[in-house]
Protein backbone atom coordinates (compact mmCIF):
# COMPACT_ATOMS: atom_id res chain seq x y z
CA UNK A 1 0.00 0.00 0.00
CA UNK A 2 1.40 3.38 -0.97
CA UNK A 3 1.62 6.01 1.74
CA UNK A 4 -0.67 8.97 1.48
CA UNK A 5 0.72 11.79 -0.56
CA UNK A 6 -0.04 15.46 -0.20
CA UNK A 7 0.39 17.40 -3.41
CA UNK A 8 0.90 21.13 -2.96
CA UNK A 9 -0.35 22.64 -6.17
CA UNK A 10 0.90 25.78 -7.86
CA UNK A 11 -0.85 27.58 -10.67
CA UNK A 12 0.26 26.18 -14.03
CA UNK A 13 -1.36 28.77 -16.22
CA UNK A 14 -3.06 31.98 -15.31
CA UNK A 15 -6.77 32.00 -16.00
CA UNK A 16 -8.46 34.81 -17.81
CA UNK A 17 -9.61 37.87 -15.90
CA UNK A 18 -12.99 36.25 -15.32
CA UNK A 19 -13.39 32.79 -13.85
CA UNK A 20 -14.47 29.98 -16.18
CA UNK A 21 -18.22 29.72 -16.55
CA UNK A 22 -18.55 26.21 -15.13
CA UNK A 23 -21.96 24.65 -15.92
CA UNK A 24 -22.32 23.31 -12.38
CA UNK A 25 -20.46 23.35 -9.04
CA UNK A 26 -18.54 20.47 -7.53
CA UNK A 27 -21.04 17.82 -6.36
CA UNK A 28 -21.72 18.19 -2.65
CA UNK A 29 -21.47 14.44 -1.97
CA UNK A 30 -17.82 14.47 -3.13
CA UNK A 31 -17.08 16.38 0.08
CA UNK A 32 -18.63 13.72 2.33
CA UNK A 33 -16.21 11.46 4.25
CA UNK A 34 -16.36 7.83 3.19
CA UNK A 35 -18.28 8.58 -0.01
CA UNK A 36 -15.70 6.84 -2.23
CA UNK A 37 -16.27 3.25 -3.30
CA UNK A 38 -12.62 2.50 -2.57
CA UNK A 39 -11.78 4.76 0.41
CA UNK A 40 -8.17 3.58 0.78
CA UNK A 41 -7.17 4.94 -2.59
CA UNK A 42 -4.90 7.94 -2.80
CA UNK A 43 -6.78 11.23 -2.92
CA UNK A 44 -4.90 14.39 -3.79
CA UNK A 45 -4.95 17.09 -1.15
CA UNK A 46 -4.54 20.66 -2.28
CA UNK A 47 -3.69 23.72 -0.23
CA UNK A 48 -7.29 24.93 -0.26
CA UNK A 49 -10.72 23.54 -0.95
CA UNK A 50 -11.75 23.30 -4.58
CA UNK A 51 -12.40 26.57 -6.31
CA UNK A 52 -10.46 29.25 -8.09
CA UNK A 53 -7.94 29.79 -5.31
CA UNK A 54 -4.27 28.85 -5.35
CA UNK A 55 -5.12 25.35 -4.13
CA UNK A 56 -6.08 24.29 -7.66
CA UNK A 57 -3.94 23.73 -10.73
CA UNK A 58 -5.42 25.40 -13.79
CA UNK A 59 -4.53 24.79 -17.43
CA UNK A 60 -6.22 27.41 -19.58
CA UNK A 61 -5.43 27.52 -23.31
CA UNK A 62 -6.91 29.02 -26.46
CA UNK A 63 -7.58 27.28 -29.76
CA UNK A 64 -4.22 27.95 -31.42
CA UNK A 65 -2.01 28.37 -28.36
CA UNK A 66 1.14 26.23 -28.46
CA UNK A 67 4.76 26.28 -27.36
CA UNK A 68 6.94 28.16 -29.84
CA UNK A 69 9.78 26.54 -31.76
CA UNK A 70 10.96 22.96 -31.40
CA UNK A 71 10.07 22.75 -27.74
CA UNK A 72 10.25 19.35 -26.06
CA UNK A 73 7.26 18.67 -23.83
CA UNK A 74 7.78 15.89 -21.31
CA UNK A 75 5.14 14.01 -19.35
CA UNK A 76 5.09 11.29 -16.69
CA UNK A 77 5.23 7.60 -17.61
CA UNK A 78 3.93 6.19 -14.33
CA UNK A 79 0.45 5.93 -12.81
CA UNK A 80 0.95 8.19 -9.82
CA UNK A 81 -0.62 11.57 -9.37
CA UNK A 82 -3.79 12.50 -11.17
CA UNK A 83 -4.64 10.56 -14.32
CA UNK A 84 -7.05 13.35 -15.26
CA UNK A 85 -4.70 16.32 -15.14
CA UNK A 86 -3.38 17.52 -18.53
CA UNK A 87 -0.19 15.72 -19.57
CA UNK A 88 1.03 18.14 -22.26
CA UNK A 89 1.70 21.52 -20.72
CA UNK A 90 2.13 23.55 -22.79
CA UNK A 91 0.67 21.95 -25.89
CA UNK A 92 3.23 21.61 -28.67
CA UNK A 93 2.92 21.04 -32.42
CA UNK A 94 3.36 17.25 -32.44
CA UNK A 95 1.66 15.76 -29.37
CA UNK A 96 -1.92 15.60 -28.19
CA UNK A 97 -4.25 14.21 -25.58
CA UNK A 98 -7.86 13.17 -25.12
CA UNK A 99 -10.45 12.64 -22.40
CA UNK A 100 -12.96 10.03 -23.65
CA UNK A 101 -16.32 9.01 -22.15
CA UNK A 102 -18.71 6.36 -23.45
CA UNK A 103 -21.85 4.44 -22.59
CA UNK A 104 -24.13 1.61 -23.71
CA UNK A 105 -27.78 1.16 -22.75
CA UNK A 106 -28.76 -1.90 -20.72
CA UNK A 107 -30.43 -3.47 -23.78
CA UNK A 108 -27.25 -2.96 -25.84
CA UNK A 109 -29.05 -0.96 -28.55
CA UNK A 110 -28.09 2.63 -27.68
CA UNK A 111 -24.73 4.26 -27.08
CA UNK A 112 -22.71 7.44 -26.83
CA UNK A 113 -19.04 8.31 -27.11
CA UNK A 114 -17.56 11.75 -26.43
CA UNK A 115 -14.02 12.95 -27.03
CA UNK A 116 -12.50 16.10 -25.49
CA UNK A 117 -9.28 16.83 -27.40
CA UNK A 118 -6.25 19.03 -27.05
CA UNK A 119 -4.51 17.97 -30.21
CA UNK A 120 -3.06 20.02 -33.10
CA UNK A 121 -3.03 16.88 -35.26
CA UNK A 122 -6.80 17.16 -35.68
CA UNK A 123 -6.55 20.70 -37.07
CA UNK A 124 -6.65 19.09 -40.55
CA UNK A 125 -10.31 18.30 -39.84
CA UNK A 126 -11.38 21.73 -38.63
CA UNK A 127 -10.28 24.96 -36.98
CA UNK A 128 -7.85 24.94 -34.09
CA UNK A 129 -6.57 22.35 -31.64
CA UNK A 130 -9.48 22.04 -29.20
CA UNK A 131 -11.88 19.49 -30.62
CA UNK A 132 -15.04 17.96 -29.13
CA UNK A 133 -16.69 14.99 -30.82
CA UNK A 134 -20.22 13.89 -29.90
CA UNK A 135 -21.61 10.54 -31.09
CA UNK A 136 -24.93 8.87 -30.27
CA UNK A 137 -26.35 5.61 -31.56
CA UNK A 138 -30.11 5.08 -31.30
CA UNK A 139 -32.22 1.94 -31.02
CA UNK A 140 -33.76 2.53 -34.49
CA UNK A 141 -30.17 2.20 -35.86
CA UNK A 142 -29.87 5.88 -36.78
CA UNK A 143 -26.97 7.93 -35.43
CA UNK A 144 -26.23 11.49 -34.39
CA UNK A 145 -22.75 12.96 -34.79
CA UNK A 146 -21.35 16.46 -34.36
CA UNK A 147 -17.86 17.92 -34.05
CA UNK A 148 -17.07 21.24 -32.40
CA UNK A 149 -13.89 23.33 -32.27
CA UNK A 150 -13.58 25.37 -29.09
CA UNK A 151 -12.15 28.84 -28.62
CA UNK A 152 -10.87 27.86 -25.19
CA UNK A 153 -10.20 24.80 -23.04
CA UNK A 154 -9.87 25.00 -19.26
CA UNK A 155 -8.91 22.02 -17.09
CA UNK A 156 -8.79 22.54 -13.33
CA UNK A 157 -7.49 19.97 -10.84
CA UNK A 158 -8.44 20.50 -7.19
CA UNK A 159 -8.70 18.47 -4.01
CA UNK A 160 -12.15 17.19 -4.99
CA UNK A 161 -11.24 16.18 -8.52
CA UNK A 162 -10.69 17.46 -12.04
CA UNK A 163 -13.06 19.37 -14.26
CA UNK A 164 -12.74 20.41 -17.88
CA UNK A 165 -14.53 22.98 -20.02
CA UNK A 166 -14.43 23.31 -23.82
CA UNK A 167 -16.26 26.48 -24.81
CA UNK A 168 -17.00 28.85 -27.68
CA UNK A 169 -18.79 31.87 -26.24
CA UNK A 170 -19.34 33.49 -29.63
CA UNK A 171 -21.07 30.39 -30.99
CA UNK A 172 -22.90 29.90 -27.69
CA UNK A 173 -21.94 26.34 -26.77
CA UNK A 174 -19.97 24.62 -24.02
CA UNK A 175 -19.24 21.04 -23.02
CA UNK A 176 -17.74 19.97 -19.72
CA UNK A 177 -16.78 17.05 -17.52
CA UNK A 178 -16.08 16.51 -13.82
CA UNK A 179 -14.23 13.50 -12.40
CA UNK A 180 -13.77 13.05 -8.65
CA UNK A 181 -10.28 12.66 -7.16
CA UNK A 182 -10.63 8.89 -6.64
CA UNK A 183 -11.98 8.54 -10.20
CA UNK A 184 -15.14 6.79 -9.08
CA UNK A 185 -17.64 9.18 -10.67
CA UNK A 186 -17.77 11.29 -13.81
CA UNK A 187 -20.35 13.89 -14.81
CA UNK A 188 -20.56 15.14 -18.40
CA UNK A 189 -22.61 18.22 -19.31
CA UNK A 190 -23.64 19.01 -22.89
CA UNK A 191 -24.94 22.43 -23.93
CA UNK A 192 -25.35 23.48 -27.55
CA UNK A 193 -28.21 24.40 -29.88
CA UNK A 194 -28.70 20.75 -30.86
CA UNK A 195 -27.71 18.70 -27.82
CA UNK A 196 -28.29 19.44 -24.14
CA UNK A 197 -28.15 17.26 -21.08
CA UNK A 198 -26.25 15.53 -18.33
CA UNK A 199 -24.68 12.10 -17.99
CA UNK A 200 -23.41 10.46 -14.78
CA UNK A 201 -21.02 7.49 -14.75
CA UNK A 202 -20.42 5.67 -11.44
CA UNK A 203 -17.51 3.25 -11.44
CA UNK A 204 -17.63 -0.41 -10.41
CA UNK A 205 -13.86 -0.89 -10.68
CA UNK A 206 -10.54 0.71 -9.79
CA UNK A 207 -8.65 2.94 -12.25
CA UNK A 208 -6.19 1.10 -14.49
CA UNK A 209 -2.78 1.78 -15.98
CA UNK A 210 -1.57 0.38 -19.31
CA UNK A 211 0.23 -2.55 -17.68
CA UNK A 212 -2.94 -3.68 -15.90
CA UNK A 213 -2.00 -2.25 -12.51
CA UNK A 214 -4.65 -0.48 -10.49
CA UNK A 215 -4.12 3.17 -9.56
CA UNK A 216 -2.23 4.35 -7.65
CA UNK A 217 0.84 2.19 -8.13
CA UNK A 218 4.34 3.56 -7.83
CA UNK A 219 5.83 1.40 -10.59
CA UNK A 220 2.76 1.05 -12.82
CA UNK A 221 3.29 2.23 -16.39
CA UNK A 222 1.03 4.19 -18.71
CA UNK A 223 3.20 3.30 -21.74
CA UNK A 224 1.60 1.12 -24.42
CA UNK A 225 3.57 1.35 -27.67
CA UNK A 226 6.42 3.85 -28.21
CA UNK A 227 5.31 7.46 -27.67
CA UNK A 228 1.70 6.48 -26.92
CA UNK A 229 0.20 6.44 -23.40
CA UNK A 230 -3.09 5.23 -21.97
CA UNK A 231 -4.99 4.88 -18.73
CA UNK A 232 -8.53 3.94 -17.81
CA UNK A 233 -9.82 6.03 -14.90
CA UNK A 234 -13.20 4.26 -15.07
CA UNK A 235 -12.93 0.74 -16.56
CA UNK A 236 -16.73 0.37 -16.37
CA UNK A 237 -19.67 1.27 -14.20
CA UNK A 238 -23.29 2.28 -14.26
CA UNK A 239 -24.42 5.22 -16.38
CA UNK A 240 -27.49 7.46 -16.33
CA UNK A 241 -28.07 9.29 -19.61
CA UNK A 242 -30.50 12.22 -19.74
CA UNK A 243 -30.03 14.19 -22.95
CA UNK A 244 -32.17 16.14 -25.40
CA UNK A 245 -31.06 15.98 -29.05
CA UNK A 246 -32.83 18.33 -31.46
CA UNK A 247 -35.78 18.42 -29.09
CA UNK A 248 -36.01 14.64 -28.62
CA UNK A 249 -35.48 13.25 -25.11
CA UNK A 250 -32.91 10.44 -24.86
CA UNK A 251 -33.01 8.83 -21.43
CA UNK A 252 -31.57 5.45 -20.48
CA UNK A 253 -29.39 3.56 -18.00
CA UNK A 254 -26.64 1.06 -18.69
CA UNK A 255 -22.84 0.76 -18.66
CA UNK A 256 -20.39 3.65 -18.93
CA UNK A 257 -16.63 4.13 -18.94
CA UNK A 258 -13.82 6.65 -19.28
CA UNK A 259 -10.37 6.58 -20.97
CA UNK A 260 -7.37 8.88 -21.12
CA UNK A 261 -5.00 8.96 -24.11
CA UNK A 262 -1.92 11.09 -24.70
CA UNK A 263 0.93 10.82 -27.18
CA UNK A 264 4.18 12.49 -28.20
CA UNK A 265 3.15 12.42 -31.85
CA UNK A 266 -0.06 11.94 -33.81
CA UNK A 267 -2.08 8.76 -33.40
CA UNK A 268 -1.33 7.74 -36.98
CA UNK A 269 2.40 8.26 -36.40
CA UNK A 270 2.51 6.04 -33.32
CA UNK A 271 -0.20 3.51 -34.02
CA UNK A 272 -1.15 1.15 -36.81
CA UNK A 273 -4.30 -0.17 -35.13
CA UNK A 274 -6.16 -0.66 -31.86
CA UNK A 275 -8.86 -2.96 -30.48
CA UNK A 276 -10.89 -2.58 -27.30
CA UNK A 277 -13.67 -4.28 -25.37
CA UNK A 278 -15.37 -2.90 -22.28
CA UNK A 279 -17.97 -5.21 -20.72
CA UNK A 280 -20.10 -5.32 -17.59
CA UNK A 281 -22.08 -8.46 -16.76
CA UNK A 282 -23.28 -9.74 -13.40
CA UNK A 283 -20.46 -9.26 -10.85
CA UNK A 284 -17.84 -8.82 -13.61
CA UNK A 285 -16.19 -5.81 -15.20
CA UNK A 286 -13.92 -6.68 -18.14
CA UNK A 287 -11.35 -4.35 -19.72
CA UNK A 288 -9.38 -5.19 -22.87
CA UNK A 289 -7.17 -2.89 -24.94
CA UNK A 290 -4.64 -3.71 -27.66
CA UNK A 291 -2.37 -1.26 -29.50
CA UNK A 292 -0.18 -2.14 -32.52
CA UNK A 293 2.78 0.12 -33.27
CA UNK A 294 3.29 1.90 -36.57
CA UNK A 295 6.94 2.60 -35.76
CA UNK A 296 8.17 -0.85 -34.70
CA UNK A 297 7.05 -3.79 -36.88
CA UNK A 298 5.03 -6.53 -35.16
CA UNK A 299 5.00 -4.75 -31.78
CA UNK A 300 1.65 -5.02 -29.99
CA UNK A 301 0.78 -4.10 -26.42
CA UNK A 302 -2.24 -5.84 -24.90
CA UNK A 303 -3.82 -5.42 -21.48
CA UNK A 304 -6.69 -7.50 -20.08
CA UNK A 305 -8.08 -7.00 -16.56
CA UNK A 306 -11.11 -8.68 -14.98
CA UNK A 307 -12.84 -7.42 -11.83
CA UNK A 308 -15.27 -9.44 -9.71
CA UNK A 309 -17.34 -7.31 -7.32
CA UNK A 310 -14.77 -4.54 -7.65
CA UNK A 311 -11.69 -6.68 -6.94
CA UNK A 312 -9.15 -7.74 -9.57
CA UNK A 313 -9.31 -11.50 -10.18
CA UNK A 314 -7.29 -11.60 -13.41
CA UNK A 315 -4.77 -9.39 -15.16
CA UNK A 316 -2.31 -10.04 -17.95
CA UNK A 317 -0.42 -8.35 -20.77
CA UNK A 318 0.46 -11.70 -22.41
CA UNK A 319 -1.53 -12.49 -25.55
CA UNK A 320 -0.26 -15.99 -26.33
CA UNK A 321 -0.89 -19.28 -24.46
CA UNK A 322 1.52 -20.22 -21.67
CA UNK A 323 1.76 -23.17 -19.29
CA UNK A 324 3.02 -21.00 -16.44
CA UNK A 325 2.01 -17.36 -16.93
CA UNK A 326 -1.44 -15.79 -16.95
CA UNK A 327 -2.53 -14.98 -20.50
CA UNK A 328 -5.53 -13.82 -22.52
CA UNK A 329 -6.37 -14.65 -26.12
CA UNK A 330 -8.78 -12.38 -27.96
CA UNK A 331 -10.37 -13.52 -31.21
CA UNK A 332 -12.64 -11.66 -33.60
CA UNK A 333 -15.86 -13.48 -34.46
CA UNK A 334 -17.85 -13.31 -37.69
CA UNK A 335 -21.25 -14.29 -39.02
CA UNK A 336 -23.39 -12.29 -36.61
CA UNK A 337 -26.21 -9.95 -37.55
CA UNK A 338 -24.50 -6.58 -36.99
CA UNK A 339 -21.41 -5.24 -38.71
CA UNK A 340 -20.24 -1.98 -40.29
CA UNK A 341 -19.36 -0.82 -43.80
CA UNK A 342 -15.59 -1.22 -43.40
CA UNK A 343 -13.67 -4.06 -45.05
CA UNK A 344 -13.41 -6.04 -41.81
CA UNK A 345 -16.89 -7.47 -41.20
CA UNK A 346 -16.24 -8.44 -37.58
CA UNK A 347 -19.42 -9.02 -35.57
CA UNK A 348 -17.99 -9.68 -32.11
CA UNK A 349 -15.18 -11.02 -29.94
CA UNK A 350 -14.33 -14.09 -27.87
CA UNK A 351 -11.98 -13.64 -24.91
CA UNK A 352 -10.23 -16.49 -23.08
CA UNK A 353 -8.60 -15.50 -19.77
CA UNK A 354 -6.41 -18.26 -18.35
CA UNK A 355 -4.37 -18.47 -15.13
CA UNK A 356 -2.44 -21.79 -15.07
CA UNK A 357 -1.01 -21.24 -11.58
CA UNK A 358 -4.40 -20.41 -10.01
CA UNK A 359 -6.34 -22.98 -12.08
CA UNK A 360 -8.72 -20.32 -13.36
CA UNK A 361 -10.29 -20.03 -16.81
CA UNK A 362 -12.79 -17.37 -17.81
CA UNK A 363 -14.56 -17.21 -21.17
CA UNK A 364 -16.49 -14.20 -22.47
CA UNK A 365 -18.44 -13.69 -25.69
CA UNK A 366 -19.36 -10.29 -27.12
CA UNK A 367 -21.86 -9.94 -29.97
CA UNK A 368 -22.48 -6.64 -31.77
CA UNK A 369 -26.06 -5.32 -31.67
CA UNK A 370 -25.78 -1.80 -33.12
CA UNK A 371 -23.27 0.56 -34.71
CA UNK A 372 -22.28 3.33 -32.33
CA UNK A 373 -19.92 5.21 -34.65
CA UNK A 374 -17.93 4.68 -37.82
CA UNK A 375 -15.17 6.65 -39.56
CA UNK A 376 -14.07 5.72 -43.08
CA UNK A 377 -10.39 6.64 -43.51
CA UNK A 378 -9.70 5.09 -46.92
CA UNK A 379 -8.41 1.75 -48.22
CA UNK A 380 -11.45 0.06 -46.66
CA UNK A 381 -10.24 0.77 -43.12
CA UNK A 382 -11.11 3.25 -40.40
CA UNK A 383 -12.59 3.38 -36.94
CA UNK A 384 -15.79 1.85 -35.62
CA UNK A 385 -17.56 1.21 -32.34
CA UNK A 386 -20.43 -1.13 -31.52
CA UNK A 387 -22.87 -1.41 -28.66
CA UNK A 388 -23.05 -5.10 -27.85
CA UNK A 389 -24.36 -7.86 -25.63
CA UNK A 390 -21.94 -9.87 -23.48
CA UNK A 391 -22.11 -13.22 -21.71
CA UNK A 392 -19.70 -15.44 -19.87
CA UNK A 393 -17.92 -16.12 -16.62
CA UNK A 394 -15.64 -18.73 -15.07
CA UNK A 395 -15.72 -22.04 -16.92
CA UNK A 396 -17.98 -24.51 -15.09
CA UNK A 397 -19.48 -21.88 -12.78
CA UNK A 398 -22.34 -19.38 -13.05
CA UNK A 399 -22.58 -17.60 -16.39
CA UNK A 400 -23.83 -14.02 -16.68
CA UNK A 401 -25.24 -11.69 -19.30
CA UNK A 402 -24.72 -7.99 -19.77
CA UNK A 403 -23.58 -5.37 -22.26
CA UNK A 404 -20.34 -4.29 -23.89
CA UNK A 405 -18.74 -1.64 -26.06
CA UNK A 406 -16.22 -2.66 -28.70
CA UNK A 407 -13.92 -0.37 -30.64
CA UNK A 408 -11.52 -0.95 -33.51
CA UNK A 409 -9.31 1.43 -35.47
CA UNK A 410 -6.93 0.85 -38.39
CA UNK A 411 -5.16 3.63 -40.24
CA UNK A 412 -4.58 3.47 -44.01
CA UNK A 413 -1.05 2.79 -45.20
CA UNK A 414 -1.10 5.53 -47.83
CA UNK A 415 -3.07 8.75 -47.40
CA UNK A 416 -2.17 12.44 -47.75
CA UNK A 417 -4.25 13.13 -44.63
CA UNK A 418 -2.32 10.77 -42.36
CA UNK A 419 1.37 11.59 -42.57
CA UNK A 420 3.93 10.88 -39.88
CA UNK A 421 5.00 13.86 -37.76
CA UNK A 422 7.79 11.95 -36.03
CA UNK A 423 10.86 14.12 -35.39
Swiss-Prot record:
Q: Which residues form the signal peptide?
A: 1-17
Its pathway?
Answer: Mycotoxin biosynthesis
Q: Which InterPro entries match?
A: DA_C (IPR054499)
- What Gene Ontology molecular function terms does this protein carry? isomerase activity
Q: Which UniProt keywords apply?
A: Glycoprotein, Isomerase, Signal
Summary of the knockout phenotype? Abolishes the production of pyrichalasin H, and leads to the accumulation of sereval compounds that appear to arise from a redox shunt pathway from 1,5-dihydropyrrolone.
Q: What is its EC number?
A: 5.5.1.-
Glycan attachment positions: 60, 92, 219
What job does this protein perform?
Diels-Alderase; part of the gene cluster that mediates the biosynthesis of the mycotoxin pyrichalasin H, a tyrosine-derived cytochalasan that inhibits the growth of rice seedlings, but also inhibits lymphocyte capping and actin polymerization and alters cell morphology. Pyrichalasin H is indicated as the responsible agent for the genus-specific pathogenicity of M.grisea toward crabgrass. The first step in the pathway is catalyzed by the O-methyltransferase pyiA which methylates free tyrosine to generate the precursor O-methyltyrosine.
Spell out the family assignment given in the record's similarity comment: Belongs to the Diels-Alderase family.
**Can you name this protein?**
Diels-Alderase pyiF
Query: Species name for this entry?
Result: Pyricularia grisea (Crabgrass-specific blast fungus)
By which gene is this protein encoded?
pyiF
Amino acid sequence: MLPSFIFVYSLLATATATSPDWPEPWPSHWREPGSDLFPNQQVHLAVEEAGTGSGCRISNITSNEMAKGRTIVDFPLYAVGSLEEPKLQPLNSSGGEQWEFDGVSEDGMQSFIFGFYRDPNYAILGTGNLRVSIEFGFEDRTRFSEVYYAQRSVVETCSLGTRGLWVDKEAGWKFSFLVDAAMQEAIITLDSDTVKGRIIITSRAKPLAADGSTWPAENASTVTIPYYYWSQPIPAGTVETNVEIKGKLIKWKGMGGHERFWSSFSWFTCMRSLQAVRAMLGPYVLSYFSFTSNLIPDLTHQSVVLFHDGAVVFRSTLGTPSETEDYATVTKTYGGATTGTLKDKVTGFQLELVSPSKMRHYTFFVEHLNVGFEYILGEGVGGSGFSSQSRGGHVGLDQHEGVALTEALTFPKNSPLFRSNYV
